[in-house]
Amino acid sequence: MEFVFYACSLIAVISTLLVIIQKNAVYSLLYLIISLLSISGIFFIFGAFFAGALEVVIYAGAIIVLFVFVIMMLNLGKKNDLQEKKYLNPIFWIGPSFLSLILFLLMTYAIFFVKDKQIYFSLIDVKEVGINLFGPYLLLVELSSLLLLSALVVVFHIGKEKK
């Protein structure tokens, strides 16, 4: 299990560095998704399954979608469209794909072949997730929802065209 931990940590560090280095915002978001998924893998390794699942759902899901909306609202014009055609070249998407493949293989190895700390699946329903979130963490959930709402309002205000 140590090998999986170090591999997930290495992928998290590499992809986070690529988030900082990358000049295009969309590819930076791809590397950010890989970084967040590898961090959730580390949560799963340490046995914090709920925190790992929340990492995937909240950060890699909702917040990344919000970032994509910001990029879409910027609307960089025809120059950006020509540059996006250039980005269809495999050299631009091979890096995120390779890191995602390594992360997928590591998680598959950890789930099926590591016997001493194997991840066991258990189904929980939405009611249990709601009770766990809105029980002791009600204030944190409400504050984070207000933060996301205010970020959405700011993005809308910045992205709105002036007439």
UniProtKB/Swiss-Prot annotation:
Belongs to the complex I subunit 6 family. It catalyses: a quinone + NADH + 5 H(+)(in) = a quinol + NAD(+) + 4 H(+)(out). Composed of 13 different subunits. Subunits NuoA, H, J, K, L, M, N constitute the membrane sector of the complex. GO terms for molecular function: NADH dehydrogenase (ubiquinone) activity; quinone binding. Pfam families: Oxidored_q3. Keywords: Cell membrane, Membrane, NAD, Quinone, Translocase, Transmembrane, Transmembrane helix. It is found in: Cell membrane. It comes from the Bacteria. The gene is nuoJ. Gene3D superfamilies: NADH-ubiquinone/plastoquinone oxidoreductase chain 6, subunit NuoJ. NDH-1 shuttles electrons from NADH, via FMN and iron-sulfur (Fe-S) centers, to quinones in the respiratory chain. Couples the redox reaction to proton translocation (for every two electrons transferred, four hydrogen ions are translocated across the cytoplasmic membrane), and thus conserves the redox energy in a proton gradient. It is an enzyme of class 7 (translocase). Its EC number is 7.1.1.-. InterPro entries: NADH_UbQ/plastoQ_OxRdtase_su6, Nuo/plastoQ_OxRdtase_6_NuoJ. It is a multi-pass membrane protein. This is NADH-quinone oxidoreductase subunit J. The chain crosses the membrane at residues 1-21, 30-50, 54-74, 94-114, 138-158. GO terms for cellular component: plasma membrane.
